[in-house]
């Protein structure tokens, strides 16, 4: 009986792109998967056809050979020659372990069989700091749930007194070679899943995984000068690798809390300093806060609200080295409230001495404003 065309099996045209082929494969594989059709021999046979068509049409070299020679390209020698060497799979059949891995790996993101022991996963920890801690540096203890190397089998997964055995199928390489017509295809060993070893007697504590769940405590040193968004890497403090492989890393993500007085921009600090209008007019000294304590700020006479005063070296020292930032104090002139009769009278006399609200001599910005307003209305009435 002639074999059905691979494109017809998947229901795609011969011009189909790989994306279309994969989409059709996933849909059909789910429909005819043996787990969904237990005991149905026709579904099992259909599933094998779908698998074979998918493997050929998603491999550029195999697809080119098939397009040119048809099924004849893969009929010379069948799947003999390189084989699994005792795996028990016939000349034209496909390894069901590999099929299941492909179907559910492609659909759910797992990919094909595992290749040897893999590196442990990286972990992330979000750490909140006060501004003072971020500026000065701090050492903090944190607790993180993770996977650690089993302390009984030391990551091997094997029972104490035993060792993992070399896989008899792949002879420890983790790979097997299959001949398909003109091609030799290498894939993960279906017996050991690419590790090259088998655990006959698993560890009683980790049950052969080589890792156990645990919450560990770490002391993390935060360098001075860090800011929100900075990330600190602790090499080897992530999850333990599989069966003795390299551990992952831990990344501490820094978030600095909002401060009641200071705002930070880069290595500079900003704060608002309220003063009364008498000091703004006459000048004087006022205490202002810094991260190192109080210092005196000299305010010159005739200071306007919004004026910035820079105190050099009172900011943050860069975590990457270099000069220290500055503290910039923004003056806010406050209008007096809760005045008694005497104070009100004094202010009235002061206002009269200014020559009214426009204050030509003493309030140049006010005069300029009202002159502009007068000109605006004069222009409207012309």
Swiss-Prot record:
<feature type="zinc finger region" description="CR-type">
    <location>
        <begin position="137"/>
        <end position="215"/>
    </location>
</feature>
<keyword id="KW-0862">Zinc</keyword>
<dbReference type="Pfam" id="PF00226">
    <property type="entry name" value="DnaJ"/>
</dbReference>
<feature type="repeat" description="CXXCXGXG motif">
    <location>
        <begin position="189"/>
        <end position="196"/>
    </location>
</feature>
<dbReference type="InterPro" id="IPR001623">
    <property type="entry name" value="DnaJ_domain"/>
</dbReference>
<dbReference type="Pfam" id="PF00684">
    <property type="entry name" value="DnaJ_CXXCXGXG"/>
</dbReference>
<keyword id="KW-0863">Zinc-finger</keyword>
<dbReference type="GO" id="GO:0031072">
    <property type="term" value="F:heat shock protein binding"/>
</dbReference>
<dbReference type="GO" id="GO:0006260">
    <property type="term" value="P:DNA replication"/>
</dbReference>
<dbReference type="InterPro" id="IPR012724">
    <property type="entry name" value="DnaJ"/>
</dbReference>
<protein>
    <recommendedName>
        <fullName>Chaperone protein DnaJ</fullName>
    </recommendedName>
</protein>
<feature type="binding site">
    <location>
        <position position="203"/>
    </location>
    <ligand>
        <name>Zn(2+) 1</name>
    </ligand>
</feature>
<feature type="binding site">
    <location>
        <position position="167"/>
    </location>
    <ligand>
        <name>Zn(2+) 2</name>
    </ligand>
</feature>
<dbReference type="GO" id="GO:0009408">
    <property type="term" value="P:response to heat"/>
</dbReference>
<dbReference type="InterPro" id="IPR008971">
    <property type="entry name" value="HSP40/DnaJ_pept-bd"/>
</dbReference>
<keyword id="KW-0677">Repeat</keyword>
<keyword id="KW-0963">Cytoplasm</keyword>
<feature type="binding site">
    <location>
        <position position="189"/>
    </location>
    <ligand>
        <name>Zn(2+) 2</name>
    </ligand>
</feature>
<comment type="function">
    <text>Participates actively in the response to hyperosmotic and heat shock by preventing the aggregation of stress-denatured proteins and by disaggregating proteins, also in an autonomous, DnaK-independent fashion. Unfolded proteins bind initially to DnaJ; upon interaction with the DnaJ-bound protein, DnaK hydrolyzes its bound ATP, resulting in the formation of a stable complex. GrpE releases ADP from DnaK; ATP binding to DnaK triggers the release of the substrate protein, thus completing the reaction cycle.</text>
</comment>
<comment type="similarity">
    <text>Belongs to the DnaJ family.</text>
</comment>
<dbReference type="GO" id="GO:0008270">
    <property type="term" value="F:zinc ion binding"/>
</dbReference>
<dbReference type="GO" id="GO:0042026">
    <property type="term" value="P:protein refolding"/>
</dbReference>
<dbReference type="InterPro" id="IPR036869">
    <property type="entry name" value="J_dom_sf"/>
</dbReference>
<dbReference type="GO" id="GO:0005737">
    <property type="term" value="C:cytoplasm"/>
</dbReference>
<dbReference type="Pfam" id="PF01556">
    <property type="entry name" value="DnaJ_C"/>
</dbReference>
<dbReference type="GO" id="GO:0051082">
    <property type="term" value="F:unfolded protein binding"/>
</dbReference>
<feature type="binding site">
    <location>
        <position position="153"/>
    </location>
    <ligand>
        <name>Zn(2+) 1</name>
    </ligand>
</feature>
<dbReference type="GO" id="GO:0051085">
    <property type="term" value="P:chaperone cofactor-dependent protein refolding"/>
</dbReference>
<feature type="binding site">
    <location>
        <position position="192"/>
    </location>
    <ligand>
        <name>Zn(2+) 2</name>
    </ligand>
</feature>
<feature type="repeat" description="CXXCXGXG motif">
    <location>
        <begin position="150"/>
        <end position="157"/>
    </location>
</feature>
<comment type="subunit">
    <text>Homodimer.</text>
</comment>
<feature type="domain" description="J">
    <location>
        <begin position="5"/>
        <end position="70"/>
    </location>
</feature>
<dbReference type="InterPro" id="IPR002939">
    <property type="entry name" value="DnaJ_C"/>
</dbReference>
<keyword id="KW-0143">Chaperone</keyword>
<keyword id="KW-0346">Stress response</keyword>
<dbReference type="GO" id="GO:0005524">
    <property type="term" value="F:ATP binding"/>
</dbReference>
<dbReference type="InterPro" id="IPR018253">
    <property type="entry name" value="DnaJ_domain_CS"/>
</dbReference>
<keyword id="KW-0235">DNA replication</keyword>
<feature type="repeat" description="CXXCXGXG motif">
    <location>
        <begin position="167"/>
        <end position="174"/>
    </location>
</feature>
<feature type="binding site">
    <location>
        <position position="150"/>
    </location>
    <ligand>
        <name>Zn(2+) 1</name>
    </ligand>
</feature>
<feature type="repeat" description="CXXCXGXG motif">
    <location>
        <begin position="203"/>
        <end position="210"/>
    </location>
</feature>
<feature type="binding site">
    <location>
        <position position="206"/>
    </location>
    <ligand>
        <name>Zn(2+) 1</name>
    </ligand>
</feature>
């Amino acid at each position: 009986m002639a074999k059905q065309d691979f494109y017809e099996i998947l229901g795609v045209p011969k011009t189909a792109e790989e994306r279309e082929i994969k989409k059709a494969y996933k849909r059909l594989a789910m429909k005819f998967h043996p787990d969904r059709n237990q005991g149905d021999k026709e579904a099992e046979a259909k599933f094998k056809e779908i698998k074979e068509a998918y493997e050929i049409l998603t491999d550029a070299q195999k697809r080119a050979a098939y397009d040119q020679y048809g099924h004849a390209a893969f009929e010379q020698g069948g799947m003999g020659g390189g084989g699994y060497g005792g795996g028990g799979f016939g000349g034209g059949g496909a390894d069901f372990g590999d099929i299941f891995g492909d179907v559910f790996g492609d659909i759910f993101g797992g990919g094909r069989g595992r290749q040897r022991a893999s590196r442990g996963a990286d972990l992330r920890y979000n750490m909140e700091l006060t501004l003072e801690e971020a500026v000065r540096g701090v050492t903090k203890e944190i607790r993180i749930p993770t996977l650690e190397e089993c302390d009984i089998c030391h990551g091997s997964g094997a029972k104490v007194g035993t060792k993992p055995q070399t896989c008899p199928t792949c002879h420890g390489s983790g790979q097997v070679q299959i001949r398909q017509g003109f091609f030799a295809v290498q894939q993960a060993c279906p017996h050991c899943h690419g590790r090259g070893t088998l655990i006959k007697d698993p560890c009683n504590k980790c049950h052969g995984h080589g890792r156990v769940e645990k919450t560990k405590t770490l002391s993390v040193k935060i360098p001075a000068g860090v800011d929100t968004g900075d990330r600190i890497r602790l090499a080897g403090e992530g999850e333990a690798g599989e069966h003795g492989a390299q551990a992952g890393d831990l990344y501490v993500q820094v978030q600095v809390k909002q401060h009641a007085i200071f705002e930070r921009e880069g290595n500079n600090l900003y704060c608002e300093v309220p003063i009364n209008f008498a000091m703004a007019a006459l000048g004087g000294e006022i205490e202002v806060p810094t991260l190192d304590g109080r210092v005196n700020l000299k305010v010159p006479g005739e200071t306007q609200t919004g004026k910035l005063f820079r105190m050099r070296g009172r900011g943050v020292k860069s975590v990457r080295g270099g000069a220290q930032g500055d503290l910039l104090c923004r003056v806010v002139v406050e209008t007096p409230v809760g005045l008694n009769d005497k104070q009100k009278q004094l202010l009235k006399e002061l206002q009269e001495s200014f020559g009214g609200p426009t204050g030509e001599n003493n309030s140049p910005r006010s005069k300029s404003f009202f002159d502009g307003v007068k000109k605006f209305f004069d222009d409207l009435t012309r």
